[in-house]
Amino acid sequence: NQRFKKLCRLPQLGVYVDEAHHLFGADLEKQIRSSGANKTSLRDTINLLAANTSIVACYNYTGTPYVKNQLLPEVVYAYGLRESIWNGYLKDADPIGFENVKSDEFLNATVTKFWQKYGGRIYDNLNPKLAIYAANVEEAVNEVVPALEEILTRLEIPTTSILLNVGDSKYTKDEDIRNFNNLDVPGSEGNEKQFVVLVEKGKEGWNCRSLFGVALYRSPKSKIFVLQATMRCLRAITDERLTATVFLSKEN
């Protein structure tokens, strides 16, 4: 295409790839070790650029260098969560384990502790938020939200602070999507949504600085999901050293 042709005219080219694990298909072994394997379009594009230009560097970045729990063999430098927290690039993390996370007791303990730690506080003109991950839409709608409404009522917190984002237009409307995208916008309606119930949302790539807590109302087998979901609350928001809280099963 025209863009590719213009890129090929550049005398020197640097390639930067974000979320680089998407360079590989689902079958990592075939993608990397089998010479006859199909290549992904992005890898093909980079290889074509290399053949037609003078690529001086190709940098690939990812927060999850795995495909189906297999570590990518091309990792040359890693800067881990621990180092990022120690050096002040991320919030610190306070994980709290529970025996049974599929219960009203878990939600009650989670919301109560979250509100005790962060309720009424403001960070960079933003209200602190708690994300609650359910396993499926029915569970989010029929179990999590009703229990959450009861808990908030008891704590004298407006139930209008609940936001449901489950990827189903029957329950999540355009206004909800707009509020979800505005969680980090001071003065917006989205900023008033402090309890965000999610299904298959808010994982990889979700950047919400005002997120101070994550609760897994499930015990997923995937370590990658646990990592991607729980680390969402670690984004730094001020120069102050802050701590986010993670509520999950002891197994996770």
Where are these regions (language model features)?
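Conserved segment of the helicase C-terminal RecA-like domain
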Residues: Q228, R232-N252
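Conserved C-terminal RecA-like helicase domain
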Residues: Q31, K102, F106-E204, P220
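SF2 helicase motor core recognition
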Residues: F195-L211, A229-C233
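Loop/turn-to-beta-strand initiation segments
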Residues: P11-G14, T53-Y59, N191-F195
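Conserved Walker B
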Residues: E19-H21, G202, S219, C233
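Extended charged low-complexity segments that act as oligomerization/scaffolding linkers
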Residues: A50-I55, L81-Y89, A93-K102, L107-N108, ...
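Conserved RecA-like ASCE ATPase "motif II neighborhood" in helicase/translocase motors
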Residues: N1-Y16, F24-L48, R178-P186, L198-E200
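Post-DEXD/H (motif II) to motif III coupling segment of the RecA-like Helicase ATP-binding lobe
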Residues: G25-A93
